[in-house]
């Protein structure tokens, strides 16, 4: 059912509340005890393993590196290789995996369980979380009957597996606190025989961005809580500002809370050892400090997702992962409690660079989606100070972004301006003139904005003296 079907009448809500009260009263004392004995959640040192499309899907969710063409045995073997890399390269002991009704109880489920089983056989904790479909994204369960059947199947298969945790829904922003407590209370009642409360992870309200409401709900006592926290939610550039942003979202429930989504750009050359002066590095410094000082677990987003600039690893071969940011990993490992000394330094937090702003539009030369894929075509976007809008004009005529990718003319007049690995070719050399034009060194064609709005393409065209071909650097 769609959102209207998920709402309960007041009468049904009252009956459900009475039933839950009776269930709680009849439960043994340890059923409502603090998870982990109130010692915190730092035992969760994890990563998300995500579908390249993101986990919002109207079909099977397939984490990067897996394939719906593979059977159980092949999926198990492929997953074992990737999960083993999470353990050895990162130090992770937890993986968060997506599920939905197109995945659970289907032909793909018969194979996908190979990934879950591979993780538990390695002694890793697994958090299974429901994502809504990409054609809904209203923060509510898409179909309550399908949702219930999905979790019933999961509970029957993994409810008694001590390594597997159930997170009823990812980012339930479509529900009020009262509605969300009602839904998750019913979830606990429905699956109380298979899944103990101590292995149920209740998402915070909104975009999982605040756990104080669910933490205070007596109906949810004994459960774990999940928080999401991202650096693109604000523009703070100091660790102190991020601490002030984060702490009110948690207090006083840190001992029950896992930050099961948190991430920052890992493929653009940032130095996470310096926490001042850059939004992303200050954010990660604050997050890891709060986690370490409050014995909170972090499940990084994502450990692996093809094409995601936040991905902490990339696939470089079958079962072989490469770390994308050593400084980012070191800061995360410190937050996990795996390092004795925080890996800080005084080097600049970001590569050198400045915005390149179109005179006609007032918007900035932008790498869409923070992509690091060679051949990505550039466009215009509102200036935001991000690393994907920070360009370094070098003495050799190259213009770099992320420290090691170059502005490149992809072809003749009318072709796109793209990013590519720097290779010293003529297509990557530019001349910045006093009139604001940026021209290719060999052909004399001008860097040109096709329009003035967000998303306008940037191409190389014959110079015509228009403001669409004039740029302000810095």
Whereabouts are the PLM-identified features?
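Secretory targeting and sorting signals
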Residues: 1-33
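Extracellular glycoside hydrolase catalytic/binding regions
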Residues: 60-76, 144-152, 156, 160-165, ...
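Aromatic-lined substrate-binding rim segments of carbohydrate-active enzymes
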Residues: 79-134, 144-147, 191-194, 283-294
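Low-complexity, Pro/Thr/Ser/Gly/Ala-rich linker/spacer regions in secreted
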Residues: 29-38, 337-356, 454, 474
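Short, solvent-exposed loop/turn segments at secondary-structure junctions
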Residues: 103-105, 134-137, 175, 266-269
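N-terminal carbohydrate-binding accessory modules
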Residues: 9, 27-94
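Lectin-like carbohydrate-binding module/patch detector with strong preference for beta-trefoil
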Residues: 348-474
């Amino acid at each position: 059912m769609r959102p209207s079907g998920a709402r309960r009448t007041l009468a049904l809500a009252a009956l459900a509340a009475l039933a839950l009260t009776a269930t709680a009263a009849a439960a043994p004392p340890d059923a409502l005890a603090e998870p982990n004995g109130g010692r915190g959640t730092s035992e969760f040192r994890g990563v998300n393993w995500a579908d390249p499309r993101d986990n919002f899907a109207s079909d099977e969710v397939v984490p990067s590196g897996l394939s719906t063409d593979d059977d159980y045995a092949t999926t198990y073997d492929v997953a074992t290789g990737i999960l083993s890399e999470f353990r050895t390269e990162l130090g992770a002991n937890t993986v968060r995996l997506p599920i939905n009704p197109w995945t659970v109880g289907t032909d793909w489920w018969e194979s996908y369980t190979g990934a879950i089983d591979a993780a538990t056989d390695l002694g890793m904790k697994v958090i299974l979380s429901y994502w809504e479909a990409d054609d809904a994204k209203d923060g509510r369960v898409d179909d309550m009957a399908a949702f219930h059947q999905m979790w019933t199947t999961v509970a029957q298969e993994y409810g008694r597996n001590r390594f597997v945790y159930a997170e009823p829904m990812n980012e339930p922003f479509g529900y009020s606190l009262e509605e969300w407590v009602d839904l998750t209370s019913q979830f606990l009642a429905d699956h109380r025989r298979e899944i103990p409360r101590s292995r149920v992870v209740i998402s915070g309200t909104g975009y999982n961005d605040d756990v104080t409401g669910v933490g205070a709900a007596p109906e949810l006592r004994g459960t774990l809580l999940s928080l999401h926290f991202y650096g693109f939610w604000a523009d703070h550039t100091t660790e102190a500002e991020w601490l002030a942003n984060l702490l009110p979202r948690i207090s006083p429930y840190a001992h029950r809370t896992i930050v099961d989504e948190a991430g920052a750009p890992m493929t653009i050359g940032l130095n996470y050892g310096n926490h001042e002066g850059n939004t992303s590095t200050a954010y990660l410094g604050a997050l890891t400090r709060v986690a370490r000082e409050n014995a909170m677990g972090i499940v990084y987003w994502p450990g692996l997702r093809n094409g995601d600039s936040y991905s902490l690893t990339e696939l470089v071969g079958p079962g072989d992962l490469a770390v994308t940011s050593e400084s980012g990993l070191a800061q995360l490992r410190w937050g996990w409690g795996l390092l004795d000394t925080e890996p800080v330094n005084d080097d600049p937090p970001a590569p050198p660079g400045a915005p390149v702003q179109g005179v006609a539009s007032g918007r900035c030369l932008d790498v869409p989606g923070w992509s690091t894929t060679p051949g990505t075509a550039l466009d215009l976007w509102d200036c935001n100070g991000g690393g994907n809008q920070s360009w370094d004009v070098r003495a050799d005529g190259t213009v770099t972004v992320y420290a090691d990718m170059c502005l490149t003319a992809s072809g003749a007049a009318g072709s796109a301006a793209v990013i590519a690995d720097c290779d010293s070719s003529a297509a990557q050399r530019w001349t910045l003139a006093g009139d604001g034009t940026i021209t290719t060194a060999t052909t004399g064609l001008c860097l040109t904005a096709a329009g003035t709005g967000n998303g306008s393409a940037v191409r190389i065209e014959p110079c015509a003296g228009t403001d669409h071909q004039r740029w302000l650097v810095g």
